[in-house]
From Swiss-Prot:
The chain crosses the membrane at residues 48-68, 130-150, 160-180, 183-203, 216-236, 239-259, 294-314. It is a multi-pass membrane protein. Belongs to the peptidase S54 family. The lineage of its organism: Eukaryota, Viridiplantae, Streptophyta, Embryophyta, Tracheophyta. It comes from Arabidopsis thaliana (Mouse-ear cress). This is Inactive RHOMBOID-like protein 8.
Length: 351
């Protein structure tokens, strides 16, 4: 049977178009790479309810903490921002972050050596990640959480981000317990540092799928550095931040194994698009081999078990590392990092 001339012409045109497209794009696979920090309009449309709940919850808890602190009533007017009344802050010499007193932080569930070892209040490991030392700490921490958390939730979904956030907070608190002193400290940065670690592992794991990698590394490093420097101030535990970062980095290799691929422009769709998508999928699967996930999971479980046993045995690494206290708090003329828990002032009037 003779093939119509028009059909032959159509087939020849399609073959010529495919050959032309293949030649013009030979050796160029930039179309299947994606920017790590993509514009919001190009990201997957997902609700970010999880990060919103985290932010709202921590704002409410900070307001409750300041209400319980009641500086105007307990410190006899030695407060900052006195116009706020009950919600005014302790003096800057006591808390440079514009927040409550040390005794209030301990009362609300902050970490302290006496509470953990003598009173066996292990529940503080769960409450400490939700507290903030002051208004400055709250703004910087939640601002960073919104930037990092929304991106991570949009890319990988709320369930995996919630697991990383909670486990990193617990791991960070356990790290902090090994270095905790009598002055109370909070570990809210641990959960956030877990997201930073997970973001870094997601970038490293899918390195060949992203462009602008140096810019992404610079952004991650900047966020890490700013939040880590804040940890040198009183009541913020940098060891918790370190523990949370390690936890998030390992859990990122375990859980974040599905990066989003950018689709080709409509004019590039067809069999060639399917072939290149298969190539990208094979590349992704090369990074997603279960051996790496299993190794990272075993390392995470080993570290978690180790710090948990050390915390239960009451190990205090400050006895073996005298300079470690400066990783957690650097004393200056403006504030002190002593082991003495600061309480609200109490004055007695003489007759």
């Amino acid at each position: 049977m003779e093939v119509p001339t028009e059909s032959k012409t159509t087939q020849i045109d399609e073959i010529s178009h495919n050959l032309s497209f293949t030649t013009s794009n030979a050796g160029d696979s930039s179309w299947d790479k994606i920017s790590f920090f993509r514009h919001r309009s190009r990201q997957i449309k997902r609700d970010t309810w999880l990060v919103s709940v985290f932010v709202l919850l921590q704002i409410v808890l900070f307001a409750v903490t300041m209400g319980v602190n009641d500086c105007s009533g307990n410190s006899h007017g030695h407060c900052s921002a006195k116009l706020l009344g009950r919600f005014s802050f302790q003096s800057l010499s006591e808390n440079p972050m514009l927040g409550p007193s040390a005794s209030t932080l301990e009362h609300m569930g902050g970490l302290s050596w006496k509470a953990l070892t003598e009173n066996h209040e292990i529940w503080r490991i769960l409450t400490s990640p939700w507290l903030h030392s002051g208004l400055f700490h709250l703004f910087i921490n939640l601002g960073s959480l919104i930037f990092v958390g929304i991106y991570m939730e949009q890319q990988f979904g709320p369930l995996r981000i919630a697991v990383i956030y909670f486990l990193s907070g617990i791991m960070g608190s356990l790290f902090a317990v090994l270095f905790v002193r009598n002055i109370p400290s909070i570990s809210s940065g641990a959960a956030f540092f877990g997201l930073i670690g997970a973001m870094l592992s997601a970038l490293a794991k899918n390195w060949n799928l992203y462009n602008s990698k140096i810019s992404a590394l610079a952004i991650i490093f900047t966020i890490f550095t700013v939040n880590f420097l804040i940890g040198f101030l009183p009541f913020i535990d940098n060891f918790a931040n370190i523990g949370g970062f390690i936890s998030g980095f390992l859990l990122g290799f375990v859980l974040l194994f599905k990066p989003q691929l950018r689709q080709m422009p409509p004019s590039h769709k067809g069999k060639l698009f399917e072939d290149d998508m298969n190539r990208s999928t094979r590349l992704k699967e090369q990074f997603d081999r279960p051996v790496l996930r299993i190794i990272c999971l075993l390392v995470f479980c080993g570290i978690l078990a180790g710090v948990l046993l050390a915390a239960c045995w009451g190990v205090n690494l400050n006895r073996h590392c005298h300079w470690c206290r400066y990783v957690d708090c650097v004393p200056t003329k403006k504030w002190s990092c002593s082991d003495m828990t600061t309480s609200c002032e109490v004055y007695s009037s003489k007759p």
